[in-house]
């Protein structure tokens, strides 16, 4: 998926950042490196949720929350204005990729084996049941092979950005 793409940008931890933490600066740096942020979504390890919900952009003696809880059932929570979803496949907090910002419109998926199906009356015969099996093989990868360097900048952009390990 997005974590295994060759051009993935890894945002480094801040100087003095504690291990296993996510800070405001990580989020801002990820946002600034994501190509096509308007189509991006955040994926995070469920263990990161308490930290994400407490992120605040400091303004004077106060601040503005970066996390916005969903106001309606079935709508996603938002982080910095984009949908945020827990993902069981994101590594644990502090490991590289525990928070991923991805523009999935730049991700290709294709099937290389058609859907196959089968059924059997033998597997659960004593229960008077019939079983079904469906198999499909597919693969996916990012359209991009490498990060983009804009014409008037040295900062690279890519559709997938993660935080590097924080130890």
Regions found by a protein language model. Give the residues of each.
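Structured, hydrophobic secondary-structure cores that serve as assembly/anchoring elements
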Residues: 1-167
């Amino acid at each position: 998926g997005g974590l295994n793409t060759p051009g993935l940008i890894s945002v480094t931890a801040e100087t003095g950042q504690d291990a296993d933490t996510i800070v405001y600066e990580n989020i801002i740096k990820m946002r600034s490196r994501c190509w096509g942020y308007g189509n991006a979504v955040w994926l995070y390890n469920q263990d990161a949720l308490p930290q994400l919900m407490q992120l605040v952009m400091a303004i004077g003696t106060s601040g503005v929350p970066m996390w916005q809880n969903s106001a309606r059932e079935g709508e996603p929570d938002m982080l910095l204005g984009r949908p945020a979803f827990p993902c069981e496949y994101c590594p644990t907090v502090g490991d590289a990729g525990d928070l991923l910002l991805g523009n999935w419109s730049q991700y290709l998926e294709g099937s290389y084996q058609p859907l196959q199906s089968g059924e059997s009356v033998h597997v659960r015969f004593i229960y008077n049941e019939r079983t079904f099996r469906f198999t499909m093989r597919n693969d996916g990868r990012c359209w991009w092979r490498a990060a983009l360097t804009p014409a008037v900048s040295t900062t690279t952009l890519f559709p997938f950005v993660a935080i590097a390990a924080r130890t």
